[in-house]
Structure formats: C-alpha cells, structure tokens
C-alpha cells in the first residue's frame, strides 16, 4: 500500500506539527496501543470539559500534509485519509461497522467511551490524496451512509486533529 501523509502534534495546542509519512499497517499498529491514564471512567465523567481535554491530550494527528507545519485550514494541502468522530454512536454501531464496512478502516474508542454510550474514531485511507475542497463532501457522504446524526461536525473540518487513543485506568 502507498505511503500516507500524516502530521503529528505533541498536543492539541501545538503550534508546529511535524509532517511525516506512514504506511496503513504502521498507522493501524500505532492506533492499537492506548495510553492508560490515572483516573477512573467515573472520575473522568465528573470532570469539567477543560479537565477532560487535559487528561486525554497525549498528542494527536491530522491525516494529511500541513504547509509550514501549521494546523490552519488554509495550510492543509491535501488529505491522505478520512478521520471521523462518532461521538453519538448508537449501541451496536461498532459491531455493525466492523461487520458491514467494505473499506479498509480502523475504529478505536475514545477516552469517554462506555458500552452504553459508544464514542469512536474511524480512520479510512484514501486510494490517492484528495484536495481540501473534496474532503468535507467525502466525509459527509460516508457519514450519511452510516447515520450522519451519530457523527460530530468536527468530522468535516479539513484541519481537525484526532487524539491518539487514551483510556481511563478501569476502561
């Protein structure tokens, strides 16, 4: 499989992001490993939005190339893969996706995921890089197939970061 462009940031607030290349297999391997954090799922649920952001921010990535290493809308030259945020996934969504998705994909749970309230990230590689103008349309088409109401609006932002997988201590 071809090399995919990816930009890494040490945190969501990083000013400079490192452009790199990865293979699909290497990206999938990286996403299999979660960082265990100290708090329990119940403690995480009780945190403020700011506290939650700090706990789960162990760095992240953008699925494409960033001009000058800046994660600004106008600096995204192209995207190599689709990154979707299913924060309102229905129970059974994960099993259905794994069973029915006909494309190469990786799905991983978010820090706030629970069996009763599934929250997942879905990553799909493109056969070739796509332009920023095409990205939102492709993302909206894909989410419409799976139930657009289950996906957060950030899924359509060309410069949206995805956090690396993190999990509460008892998650």
Model-predicted regions and their roles:
Residues 101-106, 140-150:
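A common structural junction motif
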Residues 118-121, 142:
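Low-complexity, flexible helical/coil segments
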Residues 103, 120, 160-162:
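Generic beta-strand structural signal
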Residues 115, 125-130, 151-171:
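Short, conserved secondary-structure transition motifs
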Residues 1-118, 125-137:
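Signature for HUH/AEP ssDNA processing cores
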Residues 135-139, 143, 161:
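Hydrophobic, well-ordered secondary-structure segments
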């Amino acid at each position: 499989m071809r090399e995919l462009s990816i930009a890494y940031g040490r945190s969501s607030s990083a000013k400079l992001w490192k452009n790199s290349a990865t293979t699909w297999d290497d990206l999938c391997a990286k996403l299999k490993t979660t960082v265990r954090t100290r708090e329990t799922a119940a403690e995480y649920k009780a945190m403020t939005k700011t506290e939650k952001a700090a706990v789960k921010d162990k760095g992240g990535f953008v699925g494409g190339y960033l001009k000058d290493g800046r994660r600004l809308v106008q600096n995204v030259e192209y995207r190599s893969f689709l990154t979707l945020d299913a924060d309102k996934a229905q129970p059974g969504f994960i099993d259905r996706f794994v069973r029915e998705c006909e494309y190469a994909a990786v799905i991983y749970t978010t820090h706030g995921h629970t069996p009763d309230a599934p929250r997942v990230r879905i990553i799909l590689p493109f056969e070739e890089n796509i332009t920023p103008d095409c990205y939102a349309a492709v993302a909206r088409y894909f989410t419409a197939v799976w139930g657009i109401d289950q996906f957060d609006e950030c899924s359509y932002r060309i410069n949206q970061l995805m956090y690396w997988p993190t999990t509460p201590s008892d998650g």
